[in-house]
């Protein structure tokens, strides 16, 4: 998985953020403690797999906001994918999954979030457990 773009809206410590990784071979995320470095990786994990270190689903929503959204574009294999996950406070989660075709994104979204999640896993050939146990070391889990 090669990140291309990441947009956050009211996700954890971020109100608005847009990052463009296109053309980068290596990216270094650095900053002071509490600056939100881990939140960027949590955003990617939450967008793609719906999992985060937050205690409840609503805990990913920035304090005082009504909803959080992560829009993540990445390359996997020879395809460009886009995942948009939105969580509304005390309500529901929506999930969109798209693949780029002829310069435009085409929807691969299913009727239910669970079905769309299975489609994502099928395309990536990697579930959440495989990802966190092989490619991603979450904060506080370095034991």
Model-derived regions, located:
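Extreme N-terminal "head/tail" segments of very large remodeling/mechanoenzyme assemblies
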Residues: 1-118, 122-133
